[in-house]
Amino acid sequence: NVVDGLLENDRYGNFVPSMAEDWSVSKDGLTYTYTIRKDAKWYTSEGEEYAAVKAQDFVTGLKYAADKKSDALYLVQESIKGLDAYVKGEIKDFSQVGIKALDDQTIQYTLNKPESFWNSKTTMGVMAPVNEEFLNSKGDDFAKGTDPSSILYNGPFLLKSIVAKSSVEFAKNPNYWDKDNVHIDKVKLSFWDGQDTNKPTEAFKDGSFTMARLFPTSASYTETEKAFKDNIVYTQQDSTTYLVG
């Protein structure tokens, strides 16, 4: 993950602190208040410190998503007070939307109605923070898919390179606030065109991949299952099966 939101899920699906070190909910279930950790920083793609992560970054991030009509906006558009009206142009002032930076470390959301699952939405990209100064400096080049330097990073990994139809490479952020719990130094995702279903498995067998998608319909599935039965992770039917080394 290159950009962290307020909360994240642990391996059991429980919500745990990320950029928010603590949070509270009003008795009526309409107001969620999060305290931003003071040791959270923004970094460039080269790992240089850019700025502290502040509550206002979450306001900027949501406004950016709304102004750009993000495809994921539907997740929160009718949840946050005033957001739907802003997106539809019924109000022009974003300060009327139910998101407020009370100070540098405190961000507050006001909902239209109680949502017991609201915290799950804070893990979504549409709720991610954006540094306003950096956003303005990049203009239309902000978050340009092929350019690692077009975004800032507050997460455990930095995007190092992205080559269309080839690979995407990440490196551990050495300054990440929780770096001691990040145990992988580099990640490389290799492109696969979906044609030869045996290709990912073969790459796993020869050590090129540490994880590969496994297709039960592939010609080599039975052989692979026998050889790597302890490495196969099965998921739900609407998900994917992987070999993990």
Residue ranges of model-derived segments:
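Gly/Pro-rich hinge or "lid" segments in bacterial periplasmic/extracellular proteins
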Residues: 92-95, 105, 110-182, 186
